[in-house]
């Protein structure tokens, strides 16, 4: 297997990517293709499932061929994906019955409110580790069954399949043979009991979702099957699956209880490994399965921030104060602070630990002296503030004081943001040499399943430091800024709640 590589497929919210990794965990090749975001109505977000598949298959082939290799050089494929995004398709034709409803989509918020009013939140959280929220897959499936003509009848007849994006990719890679998912993706549906690790019949009944639609649930690291498509001439083992944040936690080698990572992508996703026992959150965090390797199941606490890097995209595309996302660091660094300006980027509601679906983006503290640079700095700062809110909740739930924060994702390359994050936290923000930890985690899971890497210790030894950011801001300054942020969040919530 010396000259073979692991192919990681990273199907994200805005693009499909593929990366080849060698035995040392180095990236040998990358291919990426963006795809269309569909916004049929305010608060609705969709993708075309066929475009998800075509772009992912395309970059998989491209990543391999651009290095002069072919399918025989691939030892295994690992898949990681945007979670919760919901696809329902016809088992016979393989055609989706509706567009993919994306994790950011809020169309089922009212239905979620009605479930909460029935007093079901405690039951759902006890079983799934999740709050009732339109973010998760369950109510999206229900919406498709209720709103696509003929869908419910077909589902009752066993003719429809539901899958998160990983399931859809495996289904297509195996020419409609395998309908599977892994425990991490299943744990994000609001239908999966994280204690028994089975689909929960009571929740399925409650939401009127037929069991026959659901995929078989597997470990995150095992050989599920082999590719059968024309993308590769040879049969390649599909051997690792994990939702993007779980894969990043693994890629960051947060393999012991109390270790935390933050992935700064479109949103921010913080996850803490809590070991082999699920901790029920008292602070509006999500309890989830970190991964399963063999019979070993690790659990995690997670806080999701809906808008992180997306606030930079908004400054570029919506407001036009920067032309490229890369410009923001220099613009923000041109002022020493925001001059009292706070931006609460609740464009799609507030995520953890607030979970307020109706809050909207707000800017406070604006004066005639406020400039584009102040707005840019406030936008970057908002990413760090939101992360701090989640980390404080994690410490409260777990009883563990965080020793350091491992960072990755696109915005972790922003030194100004990383330094401010360390200042707010009062602990080091630690950036690894390979920040593509999501894809790396998927590669590790697949490689371990086929013996490409011997064991966890071999994989753990590959993690290498790029830079450590240590706190340097005086405590009084930190407290003053945090108080301003908390005031801004309270004001954003008040605006959302005042609908008289």
Swiss-Prot record:
Keywords assigned: ATP-binding, Glycerol metabolism, Kinase, Nucleotide-binding, Transferase
Top EC group: transferase
Positions annotated to bind ADP: 13, 17, 266, 309, 410, 414
EC code(s) of this entry: 2.7.1.30
Known regulation of activity: Inhibited by fructose 1,6-bisphosphate (FBP).
Pathway: Polyol metabolism; glycerol degradation via glycerol kinase pathway; sn-glycerol 3-phosphate from glycerol: step 1/1
Binding site residues for sn-glycerol 3-phosphate: 13, 83-84, 135, 244
Biological role stated in the UniProt entry: Key enzyme in the regulation of glycerol uptake and metabolism. Catalyzes the phosphorylation of glycerol to yield sn-glycerol 3-phosphate.
Protein name: Glycerol kinase
């Amino acid at each position: 297997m010396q000259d073979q590589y692991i192919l990681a497929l990273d199907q994200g919210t805005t693009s499909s990517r593929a990366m080849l990794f060698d035995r040392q965990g180095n990236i040998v090749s990358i291919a990426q293709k963006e795809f269309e975001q569909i916004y049929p109505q305010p608060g609705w977000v969709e993708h075309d499932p066929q475009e998800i598949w075509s772009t992912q298959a395309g970059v998989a082939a491209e990543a391999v061929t651009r290095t002069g290799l072919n399918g025989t050089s691939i030892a295994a494929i690992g898949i990681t994906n945007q979670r919760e995004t919901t696809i329902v398709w016809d088992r016979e034709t393989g055609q989706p019955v509706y567009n993919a409803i994306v994790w950011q989509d809020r169309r089922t918020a009212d239905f979620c409110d009605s479930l909460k009013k029935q007093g079901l939140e405690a039951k759902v959280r006890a079983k799934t580790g999740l709050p009732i929220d339109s973010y998760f897959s369950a109510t999206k499936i229900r919406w498709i069954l209720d709103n696509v003509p003929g869908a419910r009848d077909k589902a009752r007849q066993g003719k429809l399949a539901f899958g998160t994006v990983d399931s859809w990719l495996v289904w297509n890679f195996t020419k409609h043979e395998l309908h599977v998912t892994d425990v991490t993706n299943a744990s994000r549906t609001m239908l999966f009991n994280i204690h028994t690790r089975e689909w929960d019949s009571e929740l399925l009944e409650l939401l009127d979702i037929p069991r026959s639609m659901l995929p078989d649930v597997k470990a995150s690291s095992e050989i599920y099957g082999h590719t059968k498509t024309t993308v590769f001439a040879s049969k390649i083992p599909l051997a690792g699956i994990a939702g993007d944040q779980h894969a990043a936690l693994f890629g960051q080698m947060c393999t012991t209880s109390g270790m935390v990572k933050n992935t700064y992508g479109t949103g921010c996703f913080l996850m803490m490994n809590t070991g082999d026992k699920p901790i029920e959150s008292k602070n509006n965090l999500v309890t989830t399965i970190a991964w399963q390797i063999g019979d070993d199941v690790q659990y995690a606490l997670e806080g999701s921030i809906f808008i992180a890097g997306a606030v930079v995209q908004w400054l570029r595309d919506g407001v036009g104060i920067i032309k490229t996302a890369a410009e923001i660091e220099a613009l923000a660094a041109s002022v020493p602070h925001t001059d009292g300006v706070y931006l609460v980027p609740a464009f799609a509601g507030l995520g953890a630990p607030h979970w307020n679906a109706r809050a909207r983006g707000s800017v406070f503290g604006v004066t005639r002296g406020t400039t584009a640079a102040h707005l840019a700095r406030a936008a970057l700062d908002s990413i760090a503030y939101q992360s701090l809110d989640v980390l404080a909740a994690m410490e409260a739930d777990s009883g563990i004081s965080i020793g350091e924060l491992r960072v990755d994702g696109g915005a972790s390359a922003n030194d100004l943001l990383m330094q401010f994050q360390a200042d707010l936290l009062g602990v080091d923000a630690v950036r690894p040499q390979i920040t593509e930890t999501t894809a790396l985690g998927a590669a590790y899971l697949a490689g371990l399943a086929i013996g490409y890497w011997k064991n966890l210790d071999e994989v753990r030894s590959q993690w290498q430091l790029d830079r450590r950011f240590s706190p340097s801001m005086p405590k009084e300054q930190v407290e003053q800024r945090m108080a301003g942020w908390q005031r801004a969040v309270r004001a954003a919530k008040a605006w959302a709640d005042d609908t008289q």
